Amino acid sequence: MGLDDFQGQNKDELSMIEVARAILQDSGKRMAFADIVNAVQNFLGKSDEEIRERLPQFYTDMNTDGEFISMGHNVWALRSWFPYESVDEEVNHPEDEEDVPRKKHHKKVNAFIGDSDDDDIIDYDSDDPEDEDLDVDEEDTNEDDYSDDDLDDADDNELDDGIEGQLSELHQDDLDDDDE
C-alpha cells in the first residue's frame, strides 16, 4: 500500500499515521521523523499550525503502532522490513559506538533563567545555611524547661478513676443472652 492507494479519497479523512506508513512504503528506506512529517504535511496539504497541533499525537501513534520501529536518532522504518531476529541488531546503539567522534554539544539554554543576573539562581548543591544551626550546645538542652510532672507521665499505666467507674466487664453469660 502506497500513496497511490489514497488517490480519489478525501485527504481530510486520512490519518497522519496512514499517510506516514504509505510514505515509508513508497520510499523503501529509513527516514528521519522530520522528513516524514514534512512529507505527510505536503501530501495532506495541511498548514504548519494544524501539523504542529497534531504532532504530539502523531509521534505517540508512531511509537505505539506496531508497524513502525525507531532506529535511533529519531530515524524511523517499517518493522516489516526486518526479520524478527534482526530488529535489535539494526537499531543504533550509541553505547556501542565508542570509536565514532562525537559532535560538540552546544551550551543548553534554560528558558527559566534570565541571562543577565545569576544572583537569583539557586544552587541546590551548596550546603543549606540553616543546616549550620543544627549544632546542639549544652545550654540548648536545659533540663529546667521540663517539669517533673512530664517525667512521671511515662510510668502512668492506670486509667483515671473517673473513667474506670464507667467501665464494666463483659462475661460469657452476657454474650450468650444477645443470641436469644
Swiss-Prot record:
Top-level division of the source organism's lineage: Bacteria
Q: Where is the composition biased (Acidic residues)?
A: 115-163
Which intervals of the chain are annotated as region Disordered?
A: 89-180
GO cellular component terms attached to this protein's record = DNA-directed RNA polymerase complex
InterPro entries found in the cross-reference section: Asxl_HARE-HTH, RNAP_delta_N_dom_sf, RpoE
Please report the stretch or stretches of sequence annotated as the HTH HARE-type domain. 14-81
Q: Give GO terms: molecular function aspect only.
A: DNA-directed RNA polymerase activity
PROSITE patterns associated with the record: HTH_HARE (PS51913)
Q: What biological-process GO terms show up in the record?
A: DNA-templated transcription; regulation of DNA-templated transcription
| Keyword annotations of the record | DNA-directed RNA polymerase, Nucleotidyltransferase, Transcription, Transferase
Q: Which Pfam families match?
A: HARE-HTH
Task: State what this protein does.
Answer: Participates in both the initiation and recycling phases of transcription. In the presence of the delta subunit, RNAP displays an increased specificity of transcription, a decreased affinity for nucleic acids, and an increased efficiency of RNA synthesis because of enhanced recycling.
Quaternary structure and interacting proteins, as annotated: RNAP is composed of a core of 2 alpha, a beta and a beta' subunits. The core is associated with a delta subunit and one of several sigma factors.
Q: Which family does it belong to?
A: Belongs to the RpoE family.
Can you say what this protein is called?
A: Probable DNA-directed RNA polymerase subunit delta
Organism of provenance:
Lactobacillus johnsonii (strain CNCM I-12250 / La1 / NCC 533)
